[in-house]
Amino acid sequence: MSPQTETKASVGFKAGVKDYKLTYYTPDYETKDTDILAAFRVTPQPGVPPEEAGAAVAAESSTGTWTTVWTDGLTSLDRYKGRCYHIETVIGEENQYIAYVAYPLDLFEEGSVTNMFTSIVGNVFGFKALRALRLEDLRIPTSYSKTFQGPPHGIQVERDKLNKYGRPLLGCTIKPKLGLSAKNYGRAVYECLRGGLDFTKDDENVNSQPFMRWRDRFLFCAEALYKAQAETGEIKGHYLNATAGTCEEMMKRAIFARELGVPIVMHDYLTGGFTANTSLAHYCRDNGLLLHIHRAMHAVIDRQKNHGMHFRVLAKALRMSGGDHIHGGTVVGKLEGEREMTLGFVDLLRDDFIEKDRSRGIFFTQDWVSMPGVIPVASGGIHVWHMPALTEIFGDDSVLQFGGGTLGHPWGNAPGAVANRVALEACVQARNEGRDLAREGNEIIREASKWSPELASACEVWKAIKF
């Protein structure tokens, strides 16, 4: 090959490695309404400038690679590349920054949470230039959110299906979650539902084990809820966990639940995967099933404060993938800051339009347009003394789930359910009469316990429990 030919072939392409910030750090960029925006908490390695770290995140989660490649010339990087458009220091933290990245909409497949996460967080978290990386929030543009079905039914449709209005819903996880036979499990479900609960629940790891195969559990639970419905005159439900080792098996279980005529099924959306969850959500809408979502494995992803993903991102992803309920923490007994953060992502689940509010961890204004909302589920260590606070904090559009707070009643499951229902009805009535639940909550519970021996017994058992 002649020197002249070599020169012509190399025009516009220079091999080698160059700083990411030269291409992917664009502080003058004005974001578009169609961009997906991300807020990353970045902890660079020593000696790596924050601009280079932010640009590296934008590059490695979009079009970039570690070296210049000649095929860059075959496309428009300006059209497809992610851009780090702003960086701010995290107050009170050493060497931590919030890097804001804008992604063009064309980088993502329509209606696929799987593809969105594969692009944004699929590879960049192992990047050497970063000591730690956490995705704090995403802004999903309406042009992208409208490509998703979202929750199978949403809050209003669920209330209409259940014919329950004006109060939070009550639930209970059956315990022990592993080891019961299907018939004994169904008996526990029946006792809770006839006592006044709206729902009972399979726990996250109740699938189809040797001691209780899924089909037997489904049959006995269906018998229990129909019997409880006949006795109480109320519509009842049990979250039948359809999570399985394959999508085909998961769908088989959901189809059987529909054939039984039950109102709701359940899925572990993180361990089951977003593709499986979206498929199940579509089936549930088409076939009139509500879908309860458990967040098993979430703490593996969201517990570290400087690495992983915040739960608000997982909550947004669930609303897009599809689910009518999702566990979201209790707030009760937590620090005020954690309370505000929790209520921030609760609003992201329920509301149509959420304003940016950094004090609540909301980095971007989010407009869900007409996508149905998701009911947050409060569960974990709660009992009748928490009922006023839970009613005030979460409001009517919530599920308050008392596991041990029902099954731990000294008189049994049904009296435990009665105690919770009486406590809830007392709190709702007091609120509607204008009383202050935060200030008068304990007095409201004491007043109700005077005419409910079940509630009085529960109050005595858990009076010294503090969370």
From Swiss-Prot:
Record's protein name: Ribulose bisphosphate carboxylase large chain
Function: RuBisCO catalyzes two reactions: the carboxylation of D-ribulose 1,5-bisphosphate, the primary event in carbon dioxide fixation, as well as the oxidative fragmentation of the pentose substrate in the photorespiration process. Both reactions occur simultaneously and in competition at the same active site.
GO biological process terms, semicolon-separated: photorespiration; reductive pentose-phosphate cycle
Residue numbers annotated as active site: 175 (proton acceptor), 294 (proton acceptor)
Compartments where found: Plastid, Chloroplast
UniProt-annotated site: Transition state stabilizer, residues: 334
Root EC class: lyase
Cofactor, how bound (note): Binds 1 Mg(2+) ion per subunit.
A Pfam family matched in the record: RuBisCO_large_N
Names of the cofactor(s): Mg(2+)
Modified residues (N6,N6,N6-trimethyllysine): 14
PANTHER family associated with the record: RIBULOSE BISPHOSPHATE CARBOXYLASE, RIBULOSE BISPHOSPHATE CARBOXYLASE LARGE CHAIN
An annotated Gene Ontology molecular function: monooxygenase activity
Species for this entry: Calamus usitatus (Palm tree)
Reported modifications of this chain: The disulfide bond which can form in the large chain dimeric partners within the hexadecamer appears to be associated with oxidative stress and protein turnover.
GO terms for cellular component: chloroplast
Catalytic activity: 2 (2R)-3-phosphoglycerate + 2 H(+) = D-ribulose 1,5-bisphosphate + CO2 + H2O; D-ribulose 1,5-bisphosphate + O2 = 2-phosphoglycolate + (2R)-3-phosphoglycerate + 2 H(+)
